């Protein structure tokens, strides 16, 4: 029984173990299934991504359009990478590590600099020798403009002996027709040869000069060459008969000079009308240079200041510049010719200068020269030089104009291979006449405004032209608005000389535009001529006016020095045909702007030979000064006066010069009309001719008491030797002179009064102390002449001639200042002035006295007039 129970227990345990094992297996299967599903998903994702990459890589492989399996794609990719690795290794071996091009330069600028450094230029030639492109660097090297070479045959610029060799070199690739494929053109086919090229000249008649050059280049296949006409004519071969690559193959070369140039001519103008300003001395040395000059000429201002402009000019231009500068010094302004200026980079640049002379604002003397320099191109220079030489483009040629733009694609003209071969077979070496004709025509003047290209026809080849092509070329030329030229050409034999073709070519349109430009230039020249003539007339008028003033000053000096009394301004100079004249005492009274010499008479001792004098005019200047002395304000104002001089009667009587003389009964009266109650001193000036130089003239305000002869004349003086005047009484001064020989009595104009300066005391000062106005001798006058010049701008005087020589007591308180009176043994001329300040009251008086034969009666008569003013009233 125990065994049975144990067996039963063991069976139950076994069943229980089997169930647990099954459950565990189920769980493990579930886990494995989940893992497998997850792994399958990731594997599928990886395969999909791999297929996508293989497909993309297969699409990038060239050559096969069919579908490739994965292994093929991978194999070709491996081959490409291997080849690329080899190419990279080769490139790294031949690569130059140094960076040649600076970062601040563009490709065009760097190319231009490299060409200048190599003394070379780019040239593109078709297989037949037609030039389709040339760089601008050809101008400083060969003196050709790019427009002179484009669309021309290269054989026109090569000596005849080298034509066949050059043509064989250019056509050498034609022998290998099998290899003439785009792949061959892209491969290495470098070609080098040397030859001579013609240098350009301004005058086509000059002897041709050739430069030895070297061509280094290769053939290129151009895909963008337009199917344009060659020299304005369409080819005769149909386009279908030509190879597809024929007119798109050209020889691109770098042409270098065998002998480098140390100083080159820089003719490329980057920006038109570039200019800068400078200032020069009259010796043409730099005084100033503005900020625009360094980018153009390379010099900084401090590098050229003080140097002569002639140090920078070309030796061939010195003669023309010297003539231009002479014209500048003659006319004051002008325009220079075209000349070459040496820059700091040792290159010649063409300039034209407009200059003018500036003058000092005070003395009008030439100070310096202001110049405005403008940069010009070689095309303008050559056109101007040819116009000066009178060269006209009259040779038989057909011109077609094109507009060239550096930023646009170059217009390339081609010709068929058959035409080139015919030309080579017919005339491999053009004649001398043909070459000279081409030489004279390839340097045609180009219009710088539209930059047209001059195209000519090779005269050794019969031109071919259709009507439609002629119409197209005519429309193209008219649309470009350049020189309108059309021509007709007739078939000529190939062997016919070039000089026989002018009859076959005719100009059909007039040169309207050049005529218009010439008219505009002629009008500008005429306008400039009119301005110069007007300026010349103004300068001549100024010179005449200055000469007239100088003549007047010379006459004034002659009057002062006694070399002849002549008046240049004024209606008349009165003359007295008496030798001995004495002027009587003068009576002054107040007046306004008008004073009349009603009757000024000069009577001789015997009362005979009276001659009337013509009236003269005299004007004064206005001088205002205010002086206050002893509480009295006296305004010294000299207003303009018009003095009418009436007929004068002359008389003379002579006395000894050593005695004190008095007037001999001669009189002159002044009649004035008072219009304003203004206190104005009158300046009366007398011109006196004296035969000797030792005379002293005194104008006393108080006469000496010890003079017995004039005892009656001082009865009104007080003990303190002061003259007393009443409120309404006028001031009377007696002037006594000695009889002298006088040839003329003159009332000069005010222009001479600048040489006379006097010192005037006020009326208050005259009442305090006696005054004597002596004229010092020559030594004292010269010492005080400097004081006279300072006062002559403040006072203006008038003069009346009168001989005088009193000998009175001298009181050196105040002196009468004169200029240039007594000089050596010459006849002295004395200008006296006496100013008498009047009280601020109106005096309306006129005096007329009778001639007294004796001195006592005259003195008594003068005393009565001073004491009793009623006697001085006009009768």
From Swiss-Prot:
Low complexity biased stretches: 476-490, 842-857
Induction profile: Expressed in a circadian rhythm manner in the retina. Levels increase over daylight hours, reaching maximum levels between ZT12 and ZT18. Expression levels continue to oscillate during constant darkness, with levels increasing during subjective day to reach maximum levels between day/night transition. In the pineal gland, shows no robust circadian rhythm with only a slight increase in expression between ZT10-18.
Entry-linked InterPro entries: bHLH_dom (IPR011598), CLOCK-like (IPR047230), HLH_DNA-bd_sf (IPR036638), Nuc_translocat (IPR001067), PAC (IPR001610), PAS (IPR000014), PAS-like_dom_sf (IPR035965), PAS_fold (IPR013767)
The keyword Cytoplasm is annotated on this UniProt entry: yes
PTM remark: Ubiquitinated, leading to its proteasomal degradation.
Domain PAS: 107-177, 262-332
GO BP terms in the entry: circadian regulation of gene expression; DNA damage response; protein acetylation; regulation of transcription by RNA polymerase II; response to redox state
Pfam family, one: HLH
Domain spans labelled PAC: 336-379
MF terms in GO: DNA binding; DNA-binding transcription factor activity, RNA polymerase II-specific; E-box binding; protein dimerization activity; RNA polymerase II cis-regulatory region sequence-specific DNA binding
Chain positions of motif Nuclear localization signal: 32-47
Polar residues composition-biased segments: 447-468, 491-507
Annotated site residues (Interaction with E-box DNA) in this chain: 39, 43, 47
Residues modified as Phosphothreonine: 451, 461
Subcellular location(s) per record: Cytoplasm; Nucleus; Cytoplasm, Cytosol
Domain bHLH residues, every copy: 34-84
Region (Disordered): 420-507, 628-674, 794-813, 842-875
Tissue expression remark: Expressed in the retinal photoreceptor cells (at protein level). Isoform 1 is expressed in both the retina and pineal gland. Isoform 2 is expressed mainly in the pineal gland.
Position of the Glycyl lysine isopeptide (Lys-Gly) (interchain with G-Cter in SUMO1) cross-link: 67, 871
Function noted in UniProt: Transcriptional activator which forms a core component of the circadian clock. The circadian clock, an internal time-keeping system, regulates various physiological processes through the generation of approximately 24 hour circadian rhythms in gene expression, which are translated into rhythms in metabolism and behavior. It is derived from the Latin roots 'circa' (about) and 'diem' (day) and acts as an important regulator of a wide array of physiological functions including metabolism, sleep, body temperature, blood pressure, endocrine, immune, cardiovascular, and renal function.
Protein name stated in the entry: Circadian locomoter output cycles protein kaput
Organism: Gallus gallus
């Amino acid at each position: 029984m125990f065994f049975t129970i144990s067996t039963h227990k063991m069976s139950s345990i076994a069943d229980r173990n089997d169930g647990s094992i099954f459950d565990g297996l189920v769980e493990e299967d579930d886990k494995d299934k989940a893992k497998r599903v997850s792994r399958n998903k990731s594997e599928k994702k990886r395969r999909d991504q791999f297929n996508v990459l293989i497909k993309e890589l297969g699409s990038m492989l060239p050559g096969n359009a069919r579908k490739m399996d994965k292994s093929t794609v991978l194999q070709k990719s491996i081959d490409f990478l291997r080849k690329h690795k080899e190419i990279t290794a080769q490139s790294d071996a031949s690569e130059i590590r140094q960076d040649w091009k600076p970062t601040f330069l563009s490709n065009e600028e760097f190319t231009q600099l490299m060409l200048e450094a190599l003394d070379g230029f780019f040239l593109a030639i078709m297989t037949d020798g037609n030039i389709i492109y040339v760089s601008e660097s050809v101008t400083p090297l060969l003196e050709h403009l790019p427009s002179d070479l484009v669309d021309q045959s290269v054989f026109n610029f090569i000596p005849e002996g080298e034509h066949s060799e050059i043509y064989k070199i250019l056509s050498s690739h034609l022998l290998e027709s099998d290899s003439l494929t785009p792949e061959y053109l892209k491969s290495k086919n470098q070609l080098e040869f040397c030859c001579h090229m013609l240098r350009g000249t301004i005058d086509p008649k000059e002897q041709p000069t050739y430069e030895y050059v070297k061509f280094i280049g290769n053939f290129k296949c151009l895909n963008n060459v337009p199917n344009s006409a060659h020299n304005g004519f369409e080819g005769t071969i149909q386009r279908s008969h030509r190879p597809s690559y024929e007119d798109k193959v050209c020889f691109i070369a770098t042409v270098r000079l065998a002998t480098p140039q140390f100083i080159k001519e820089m003719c490329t103008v980057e920006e038109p009308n570039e200019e800068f300003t400078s200032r020069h001395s009259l010796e043409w040395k730099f005084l100033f240079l503005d900020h625009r000059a360094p980018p153009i000429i390379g010099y900084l201002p401090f590098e050229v200041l003080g140097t002569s402009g002639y140090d920078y000019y070309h030796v061939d231009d010195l003669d023309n510049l010297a003539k231009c500068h002479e014209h500048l010094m003659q006319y004051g302004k002008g325009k220079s010719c075209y000349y070459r200026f040496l820059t700091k980079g040792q290159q010649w640049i063409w300039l034209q200068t407009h200059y003018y002379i500036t003058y000092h604002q005070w003395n009008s003397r030439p100070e310096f020269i202001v110049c405005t320099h403008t940069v010009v191109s070689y095309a303008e220079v050559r056109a101007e030089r040819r116009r000066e030489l009178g060269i006209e483009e009259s040779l038989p040629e057909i011109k077609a104009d094109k507009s060239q733009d550096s930023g646009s694609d170059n217009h390339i003209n081609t010709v068929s291979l058959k035409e080139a071969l015919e030309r080579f077979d017919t005339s491999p070496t053009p004649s001398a006449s043909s070459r000279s004709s081409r030489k004279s025509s390839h340097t045609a003047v180009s219009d710088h405004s539209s930059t047209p290209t001059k195209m000519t026809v090779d005269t050794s080849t019969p031109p071919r032209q259709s009507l439609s092509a002629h119409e197209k070329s005519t429309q193209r030329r008219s649309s470009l608005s350049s020189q309108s030229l059309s021509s007709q050409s007739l078939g000529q034999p190939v062997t016919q000389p070039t000089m026989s073709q002018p009859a076959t070519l005719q100009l059909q349109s007039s040169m309207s535009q050049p005529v218009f430009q010439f008219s505009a230039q002629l009008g500008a020249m005429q306008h400039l001529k009119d301005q110069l003539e007007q300026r010349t007339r103004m300068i001549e008028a100024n010179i005449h006016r200055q000469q007239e003033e100088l003549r007047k000053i010379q006459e004034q000096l002659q009057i002062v020095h006694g070399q002849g009394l002549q008046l240049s301004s004024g209606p008349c100079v009165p003359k007295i045909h008496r030798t001995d004249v004495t002027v009587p005492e003068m009576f002054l009274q107040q007046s306004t702007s008008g004073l009349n010499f009603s009757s000024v008479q000069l009577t001789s001792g015997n009362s005979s030979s009276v001659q009337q004098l013509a009236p003269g005019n005299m004007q004064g200047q206005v001088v205002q000064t205010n002086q206050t002395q002893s509480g009295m304000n006296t305004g010294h104002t000299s207003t303009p006066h018009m003095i009418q001089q009436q007929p004068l009667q002359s008389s003379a009587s002579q006395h000894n010069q050593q005695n004190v003389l008095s007037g001999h009964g001669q009189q002159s009266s002044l009649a004035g009309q008072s219009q304003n109650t203004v206190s104005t001193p009158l300046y009366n000036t007398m011109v006196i001719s004296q035969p000797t130089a030792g005379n002293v003239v005194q104008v006393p305000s108080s006469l000496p008491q010890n003079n017995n002869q004039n005892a009656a004349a001082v009865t009104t003086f007080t003990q303190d030797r002061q003259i007393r005047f009443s409120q309404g009484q006028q001031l009377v001064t007696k002037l006594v002179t000695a009889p002298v020989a006088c040839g003329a009595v003159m009332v000069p104009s005010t222009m001479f009064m600048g040489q006379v300066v006097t010192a005037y005391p006020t009326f208050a000062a005259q009442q305090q102390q006696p005054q004597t106005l002596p004229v010092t001798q020559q030594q004292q006058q010269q010492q005080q002449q400097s004081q006279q010049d300072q006062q002559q701008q403040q006072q203006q005087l008038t003069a009346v001639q009168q001989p005088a020589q009193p000998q009175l007591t001298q009181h050196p308180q105040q002196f009468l200042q004169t200029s240039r009176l007594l000089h050596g043994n010459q006849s002295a001329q004395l200008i006296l002035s006496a100013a008498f300040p009047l009280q601020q009251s109106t005096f309306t008086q006129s005096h007329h006295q009778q001639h007294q034969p004796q001195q006592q009666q005259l003195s008594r008569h003068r005393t009565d007039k001073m004491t009793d003013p009623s006697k001085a009233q006009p009768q």
